[in-house]
């Protein structure tokens, strides 16, 4: 079956347009991947957001002087569409030789265009380099599981059967790993990520979680669907009172993608990690 991104700019030679071109944005419906995971878009078992951070954002003032900034975009996890990443990059590059009278005008333009393609309101925040530089680099909450001893032989597809828990013990804990890797389903390029699991429920075996995450290593899927698959596999196993799965991926093409899925109200810390 042809992947819905096959008609996107991914994996194709592209002309870089330097003047405002919102038509470059390419939507990819979430519906087919939701169906693959047994989800109904009208009744999702989580709340969430996809945080995109742009480090290659520039435009012109009326004087012709360039401005640079860092852009933060929050796309609702229940939006009908994701925005294909290369088309997002091409769209942002089309702002390079475009005049905007103010930061506010650009922010409103970005929010309008991205919301139209995603199918739900997208929150946009533009930040100065000085503001972001003052925040430094964050660390993930909880215990890192990457030094645990595991044995792994299969990497082609996620293996939820590796996950184990102790149903006789209920715990509340935060775990994280920097060993998440999957591949772009169109180009095959590697996607490197760090992942947080926060939950209250049956005690999860930490080594089994690490082995499970490593089983994604050759799996081909987008960032958002990988996080949703992890959320659902953990939810089925743990039957938790609360569960949050949050991944922060290494940037490509000046963009990083950070999907967040939770049973709880959104409390997202969009703080950059050392690899971002």
Curated annotation (Swiss-Prot):
Question: Where does the record place it?
Answer: Cytoplasm
The record's Gene Ontology biological-process terms are: queuosine biosynthetic process; tRNA modification
Carries keyword Transport? no
Named in its record, the pathway it takes part in is: tRNA modification; tRNA-queuosine biosynthesis
Binding residues annotated for NADPH, in chain numbering: 85-86, 252-253
Q: Which Gene3D superfamilies match?
A: 3.30.1130.10
GO CC, any one term: cytoplasm
- Write the record's keywords in alphabetical order, separated by commas: Cytoplasm, NADP, Oxidoreductase, Queuosine biosynthesis
Is Cytoplasm there in the keyword field? yes
Q: Which InterPro entries match?
A: GTP-CH-I_C/QueF, NADPH_dep_7-cyano-7-deazaG_red, QueF, QueF_N, QueF_type2
| Pfam families referenced in this protein's UniProt entry, alphabetically | QueF, QueF_N
Q: What PANTHER family does the entry give?
A: NADPH-DEPENDENT 7-CYANO-7-DEAZAGUANINE REDUCTASE
Q: Subunit details for this protein?
A: Homodimer.
Its function?
A: Catalyzes the NADPH-dependent reduction of 7-cyano-7-deazaguanine (preQ0) to 7-aminomethyl-7-deazaguanine (preQ1).
Q: Which HAMAP family match?
A: QueF_type2 (MF_00817)
Q: Which NCBIfam families match?
A: QueF
Name this protein carries in UniProt: NADPH-dependent 7-cyano-7-deazaguanine reductase
UniProt source species: Ectopseudomonas mendocina (strain ymp)
Q: What is the lineage of its organism?
A: Bacteria, Pseudomonadati, Pseudomonadota, Gammaproteobacteria, Pseudomonadales
Query: What's the gene?
Result: queF
């Amino acid at each position: 079956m042809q992947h819905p991104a096959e008609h996107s700019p991914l994996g194709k030679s592209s002309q870089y347009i330097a003047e405002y071109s919102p038509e470059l944005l390419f939507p990819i419906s979430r519906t087919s991947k939701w169906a693959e995971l047994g989800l109904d878009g009208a009744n999702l078992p989580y709340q969430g957001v996809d945080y995109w951070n742009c480090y290659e954002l520039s435009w012109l003032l009326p004087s012709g002087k360039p401005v640079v900034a860092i852009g933060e975009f929050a796309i609702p996890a229940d939006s009908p569409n994701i925005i294909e990443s290369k088309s997002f990059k091409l769209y942002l590059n089309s702002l390079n030789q475009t005049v905007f009278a103010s930061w506010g005008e650009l922010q409103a333009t970005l929010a309008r265009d991205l919301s139209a393609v995603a199918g739900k309101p997208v929150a946009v925040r533009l930040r100065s380099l000085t503001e972001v530089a003052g925040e430094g680099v964050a660390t993930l909450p909880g215990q890192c599981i990457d030094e645990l001893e595991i044995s792994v032989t299969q990497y082609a597809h996620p293996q939820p059967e590796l996950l184990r828990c102790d149903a006789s013990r209920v715990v509340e804990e935060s775990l994280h790993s920097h060993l998440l890797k999957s591949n772009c389903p169109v180009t095959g390029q590697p996607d490197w990520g760090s992942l947080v699991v926060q939950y209250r429920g049956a005690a999860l075996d930490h080594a089994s979680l690490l082995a499970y995450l490593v089983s994604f290593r050759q799996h081909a899927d987008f960032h958002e669907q990988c996080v949703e698959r992890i959320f659902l596999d953990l939810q089925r196993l743990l039957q938790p009172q609360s569960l949050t799965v949050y991944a922060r991926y290494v940037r490509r093409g000046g963009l990083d993608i950070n999907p967040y899925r939770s049973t709880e109200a959104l409390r997202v810390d969009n703080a950059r990690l050392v690899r971002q």
